[in-house]
Amino acid sequence: DKNDFISFIKIRNKHMFDIHENILNKVTNDNHMIDIVKMAEETEDSSFIRLCYNYIPLTFGRRHGDPSRPWNNFDIKVKDKFDKQLLYYEGNWRDIFQNWEALSISYPLALESMLSNFVNNCTADGYNPYRITRDGIDWEIFEPDNGWSNIGYWNDHQIIYLLKFLEHLSRFNNHILINFLDKDIFSYANVPYEIKDFDQLIDDPKLTINFDFKKNDKINHLIEAVGTDGKL
């Protein structure tokens, strides 16, 4: 969907939309995900290429399966405010990639984009944000009186999810995987949680992270100026 793709670029990065507006207007509803990536690669703009790899025209919503858990709130959005079809997904980190692992087997042409989303949404120290959505990543804001407010900063399951995408892509088209290795088109998630130093971890191993409110405010200003790429 041309309009959905253009909307995706605008939300993620306003500057990229302004720079490549002429190219974006040439996209048609008949273009495939692969066509969009090829178009982006011709620009040799690494940020634009990253965005086009990240685009997946899915509609899906899921959080953790237990409805009694306090974080099990999510939207399944299928129509926009004009009652037109909406391509939108959201879910907790592991729920999204658990489902995409299975989806990649039935639709392997999306593997490059799924792998790109995984890599681009990890932090530099190997952790992950709380949620993945069509519009970008999200995290919990720490609330001193709410013990559930900062549960979403983990590195559990990281290796197995990545391994499965790599295995599937290697079997589907190993040439694509090899070419990815020297492409400078990936990013890190800039999550405002920080691991406490070693002495603090020893003092209280149940309280292992700090939330950087100043960093969070700075990121929010970047989002207003640039788009949700301000979280990277």
Predicted feature residues:
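Acidic, mature catalytic/reactive cores of soluble proteins
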Residues: 1-232
